[in-house]
Amino acid sequence: MAELTMPELASAMRAAVRKLVDQLDAEQRRRGVFPFDGDLHKRWTYLPGERPGLRLGDLTDVQLDVALDLLELAHSVRGWSDTQLVIRIEAARRELALQQADRSDIDPYRDLPYWLVVLGDPRSTEPWAWRINGHHLLAQATIVGDQVGGVPHFFGAEPATVLAGPHTGLRALPREEDLARELMLTLQEDQRSLAQIATTAPADIASRWDPVVSLPERPRGISYGHLDRGQRELFEALLRQYVDRATPAVANQAWVDITDAGLQQVCFGWAGPVEPGTGRGGGRADRRSW
């Protein structure tokens, strides 16, 4: 797919969602189209369970194709590959859970728990958005004029590495984990004492899915300013690993916003064991205003 400018991306998303909404019957519109200014715009979760909206498995083939086009439009080539990986991990998890049932294979898009919602009217000049959300997956785009925002966005997986079945060894988001661990392993003893925020990994994500994250007065971890040149390059690569999931026009603008706000304020923290194979561990980036 050719790289789109921001106005081209906004236009492509607008055309796709208009096409999709035109194909919805009255009941589908009732379940899948909501006001932009309602609370649903900020209400989402990565946990399993039902969501408001249209389950992808209930869409017609034509409607499903448009929904998947939207999902691909929202991501870079690598981001789209990561999206498919997250879906494959979820499919593998369910395959293992359904071994006792008379089902040996599932369609990842039709059988897995993902829902589509449209927020607002893509025909109007007012802000509007669309979202595809399900277990461990959230992609949302908010369109204001010819500008596109790509948050909130979430990838996750459980298990992080598939341990049984035909997908044994498949890792979810391996580059994120490897970059964070590589950075941690380059730190000197005094640096590592700052970066190590806990000896055990938390049971869940610290910020959960809250629309406004309450951060401590002083960010935990080691700041960008306390890293040497090579470590800063690793830190930036780790940040870009997340930012560059988005389509380039959105990712590049996000990176400008981050660097303009100041990388010096960003901190890296690690919780849990560092050496691979010694237990669950993970890193995070933290900044009071981000």
Short names for language-model regions:
Residues 16, 179-183, 234, 238:
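Short, hydrophobic/aromatic alpha-helical segments in well-folded domains
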Residues 4-8, 41-42, 169-170:
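A short, ordered amphipathic alpha-helix with a cationic face
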Residues 43-213, 217-220:
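Acidic/His-rich structured neighborhood in mature extracellular/periplasmic domains
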Residues 123-143, 266-290:
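Long, His/Glu/Asp-enriched segments that create or flank divalent metal/ion-associated functional microenvironments
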Residues 223:
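Conserved active-site beta-strand-loop modules that form the wall/rim of enzyme catalytic pockets
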